[in-house]
Regions:
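Bacterial N-terminal signal peptides
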Residues: 8-16
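Bacterial N-terminal signal peptides that target proteins for export
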Residues: 1-8
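Function-determining sites in protein domains
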Residues: 21-176
Length: 176
């Protein structure tokens, strides 16, 4: 009887979206890497509301068809080839609001300014951030590149360009 009860509880938990279980929202997103001398922090709740870690692929046991972009990925386009090696690459760190601020998910991000294409890499089992990510959510598409969501590209690229301009004027001796 205990075994049946335990299996029922496990089945119920697997069918429940991770976002309902966690009741945690993205508290902060940090963009670092490439030529950024200091990380960019996104803390505006209205902006963060668009980029929830616990949304998209892997957040349901019975995966719905993903017809809309979410998190920072354009899911309907599916996986894509690795972007060109010469593109600037950034680490995007996601912090959740669970009793206290905690880093819970990291992805790689690259953007091709000429084509306007952005790319997101979900670390795979042999990658540095996989264990941390898998502790939060296993999307079952880890280790693959995806096209980034254009809404994410718009926010990220505006912030990156702004920071690069600040760095450029500071490096030339002009205060921003």
């Amino acid at each position: 009887m205990k075994r049946i009860a335990a299996l029922s509880v496990v089945s119920l938990l697997l069918a429940t979206p991770a976002s309902l279980l966690a009741k945690a929202s993205t508290l902060k997103i940090v963009i670092q890497g490439a030529d950024l001398t200091t990380p960019i922090q996104i803390t505006d709740r209205k902006v963060l509301a668009n980029f929830q870690v616990l949304s998209g692929k892997g957040t349901y046991a019975n995966e719905p068809r993903l017809e809309e972009p979410s998190f920072v990925i354009d899911w309907p386009q599916g996986p894509t080839a690795e972007p060109p090696k010469g593109l600037p690459r950034y680490q995007i760190l996601f912090y959740l609001d669970r009793r206290n601020e905690r880093l819970v998910y990291t992805v790689a991000y690259a953007f091709e300014a000429v084509t306007g294409e952005g790319y997101v890499y979900l670390p795979g089992k042999n990658d540095e951030n996989y264990k941390q990510n898998a502790h939060t959510i296993v999307r079952r598409v880890d280790g693959k590149w995806f096209h980034s969501w254009d809404k994410w590209d718009s926010v990220a690229q505006q912030l990156i360009r702004s920071r690069e301009r600040e760095q450029s004027t500071t490096a030339s001796g002009i205060e921003p």
